[in-house]
Every structure is written in structure tokens, then in C-alpha cells.
């Protein structure tokens, strides 16, 4: 992790790390899981542990001690961010999914292929946004699609 942070800082780029998300992995995912606090501990010599205001992004940003940038940590399991998440995901097969950790998708592909109007498409997008949860869960639902099938 430190090497990637140094590389990004040398180019004035932002690097973001995401916790392993247990999609279709079964119980062994915990062997590879690294929570945010452990990521911060591994980067303690490079990153100020005081979070910056991240707004509505899933990432929480931390300033580099050398002043040459920031590091983002996306922590859906150890530090859920559902209340401030502004993301939707368009799946590989044409569905709009409001939350990776909840069932429920809105089909866009069929509407687009049928020549739906801009207003009809906007209504479908609003429907998906309305399906975003205010609070999250630490695991995707049983039988959840893999990230490959979701388009991630």
C-alpha cells in the first residue's frame, strides 16, 4: 500500500483503496479482508489519520503527511457510508442497481430498446434513486451477483 501511495503522491494523483467486498466469495473472504483501521495503521507514517470532509462520496479522504496529496479509503464494511452514498451502478446486462448490498434493480435496457422518452428514462432513474437505503448492511444478500456480473 505504501508504495502505491508514494507513486501517486509523486505524480500528484489520488489513490483510493477499497475494502474487500465479499461478493460470491463464501466465508473465506475474511482471510483477505483488511478493515479501514488496519489500512490506516499500515499507512501511519504517510497519512494523517484525521479524515477530511468527503461530502457524498463513498471514500473517506486522508491528507498525506508530506502535503503532496490525499489517500481515499472506501470502507463499506468497517465504516458503512450508505447515508452519504450518491452512487448507482449500471449492470453489465442493463439494470440500474441503487445499492450493491441490497436486492432490487430497475431495468433500463428494455426501456431504451423500446425507444422510451427522456421523461420515461428519467422516471426509471428516479425510481432507482428512491430505492437507495438510508442505512446499510455489512454483507451482500445471499445469492447476490458477483462483481463481474454487476459490472464492477
What is the meaning of each model-derived region?
Residues 1-72, 110:
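Radical SAM enzyme [4Fe-4S]-AdoMet core and its adjacent flexible, acidic
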Residues 2, 10, 56, 75-78, ...:
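Generic serine detector
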Residues 83-152:
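Flexible mid-to-C-terminal extensions adjoining Fe-S/redox cofactors in radical SAM and related proteins
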Residues 65-95:
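Active-site oxyanion/phosphate-handling segment shared across diverse enzymes
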Residues 22, 78-79, 102-104:
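Short, solvent-exposed loop/turn segments at secondary-structure junctions
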Residues 19, 75, 100:
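Short secondary-structure boundary segments
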Amino acid at each position: 500500500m505504501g508504495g502505491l501511495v508514494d507513486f501517486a503522491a509523486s505524480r500528484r494523483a489520488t489513490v483510493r483503496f477499497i475494502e474487500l467486498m465479499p461478493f460470491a466469495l463464501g466465508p473465506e473472504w475474511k482471510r483477505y479482508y483488511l478493515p479501514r483501521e488496519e489500512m490506516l495503521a499500515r499507512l501511519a507514517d504517510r497519512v494523517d489519520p484525521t479524515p477530511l470532509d468527503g461530502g457524498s462520496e463513498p471514500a473517506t479522504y486522508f491528507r498525506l503527511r508530506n502535503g503532496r496529496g490525499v489517500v481515499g479509503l472506501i470502507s463499506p464494511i468497517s465504516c458503512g457510508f450508505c447515508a452519504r452514498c450518491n452512487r448507482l451502478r449500471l449492470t453489465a446486462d442493463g439494470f440500474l442497481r441503487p445499492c450493491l448490498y441490497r436486492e432490487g434493480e430497475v431495468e433500463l435496457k428494455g426501456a431504451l430498446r423500446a425507444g422510451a422518452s427522456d421523461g420515461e428514462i428519467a422516471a426509471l432513474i428516479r425510481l432507482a434513486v428512491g430505492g437507495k437505503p438510508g442505512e446499510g448492511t455489512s454483507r451482500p444478500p445471499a445469492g447476490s451477483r458477483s462483481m463481474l456480473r454487476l459490472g464492477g
